[in-house]
Amino acid sequence: MPEGDTVLQTAKRLHTALADQVLTRSDLRVPRFATADLTGRTVLGTLSRGKHLLTRIEGGLTLHSHLRMDGSWRVYATAERWRGGPAHQIRAILSTADHTAVGYRLPVLELLRTVDEGKAVGHLGPDLLGPDWDPDTALHNLLAAPARPLGEALLDQRNLAGIGNIYKAELCFLARATPWLPVGDLPATTAVRLVATAKQLLEANRDRPVRTTTGSRARGYLPTERLWVYGRTHRPCLRCGAPIRAAEQDTRPTYWCPRCQSGPTP
């Protein structure tokens, strides 16, 4: 599941493959930009902003994409077989002499002027992995609506950018609060520590191929000890042994330990 750390990794891969290279092929398979032709333009670079990707292109253009739940960018050598999914799932193709970047299942793909990037990402709060990171502003934003459930406040990218559903559940566990606890009910020291922990976790995972919040490097698709609660329904809590519970919050699954975490539950 793409979150701020994995989106940053995607940006790095795209930047390494495309930056300072001339596009030999461009194909944007979305109706609004289907006729756009970027062939012959030089890619200036790719960067991430929260969970958004911005690929800047010669001529004052930016290709903005967002992966949401299922999207991905894959980079292939020129003669390499594409293995990211069936052809009908491809939304973008950017080729240079040496590499091809293929965007699969991209729910957001738009071409805009670079000077207008703010229309796509200007609403975001401080980026946990960006140069604009400001913990004080992030904390202020997070607590601005005291009655709002903590889980919802953490997912709101206007508060702080980069947290997705996995980090939401993990941060609530580490704060010993259920995702439904009103954010204003967090003790002041806990709220400060929560923001610092969010930064610490994303920084720790920014270059890791497998995300972990517990320190474990175990691999595998099935839930392991890499995460405290996410995806571990009915498994014993790694701290107290109580079975982890799961429920939906704002249409997304969330996870918590009924013994370690205090606050309202469904």
Predicted regions and their residues:
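Alpha-helical structural motif
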Residues: 3-6, 10, 19, 117-120, ...
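Phosphate/anion-contacting hairpin/loop surfaces
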Residues: 63-174
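A cross-family signal for N-terminal binding/gating loops and helix N-caps
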Residues: 1-104, 108-112, 239, 252-256, ...
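Basic, nucleic-acid-binding surfaces and adjacent catalytic neighborhoods in DNA/RNA-processing proteins
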Residues: 22-38, 44-47, 81-83, 141-266
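Acidic-enriched, low-complexity/disordered segments with a strong bias for Aspartate over Glutamate
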Residues: 5, 20, 27, 37, ...
